C-alpha cells in the first residue's frame, strides 16, 4: 500500500491580510480541512495547512501497526524546501535564525510541525501551482474560500 497523499495550500488576500489554509486527501479530496485568520501571511497559511493535515493524520497506522506513510504535496517551495533541503536542521542549530542571521518567521508553527515530522513517516513533494493538477486546484479553491471576508 502506498502513502496517504495529502495536498495542502495557503492563500492570502494582501500579504499580510486575511488568509486561508486547506488540505485534502487524494484521490477524491475527502476528508479535507480548512480555516482562516483575519490577519496573516501567505507563508504562514502554507505552513499551517501542513501542520493541521499532519495533526489530523499522524496517528494513523499502516497495515503492520507502524506509522502510515504520508506524502504532503504542496505548491509552496517554502514548505517543501524546508524539509527536502533540511533548512529546519540549520535553523535549530543556529538558534532559530535563518542564513541571513534573522529570526525564522513562523517559528511558532515550524516547531510543532518539525516535531510531527520527526515522529511521522512523511515525505514532501512540490507541485507547480495553477498548472492543472486537479487536487492542487481543489485545495487552492478551499483555501481561498476559507479567507475571512
Predicted regions and their residues:
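RNase H-like nuclease fold core
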Residues: 1-44, 55-57, 144-145, 149
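RNase H catalytic domain
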Residues: 11-15, 51-138
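Short, conserved alpha-helix that lines the donor NDP-sugar binding/gating region
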Residues: 46, 50
Amino acid at each position: 500500500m502506498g502513502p496517504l497523499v495529502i495536498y495542502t495550500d495557503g492563500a492570502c488576500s494582501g500579504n499580510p491580510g486575511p488568509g486561508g489554509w486547506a488540505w485534502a486527501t487524494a484521490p477524491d479530496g475527502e476528508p479535507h480541512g480548512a480555516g482562516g485568520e483575519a490577519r496573516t501571511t501567505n507563508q504562514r497559511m502554507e505552513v499551517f495547512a501542513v501542520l493541521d493535515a499532519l495533526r489530523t493524520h499522524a496517528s494513523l497506522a499502516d497495515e503492520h501497526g507502524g506509522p502510515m506513510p504520508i506524502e504532503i504535496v504542496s505548491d509552496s517551495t517554502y514548505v517543501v524546501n524546508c524539509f527536502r533541503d533540511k533548512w529546519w536542521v540549520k535553523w535549530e542549530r543556529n538558534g532559530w535564525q535563518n542564513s541571513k542571521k534573522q529570526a525564522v518567521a513562523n517559528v511558532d508553527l515550524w516547531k510543532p510541525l518539525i516535531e510531527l515530522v520527526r515522529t511521522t513517516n512523511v515525505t514532501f513533494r512540490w507541485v507547480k501551482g495553477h498548472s492543472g493538477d486537479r487536487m492542487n486546484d481543489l485545495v487552492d479553491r478551499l483555501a481561498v474560500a476559507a479567507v475571512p471576508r
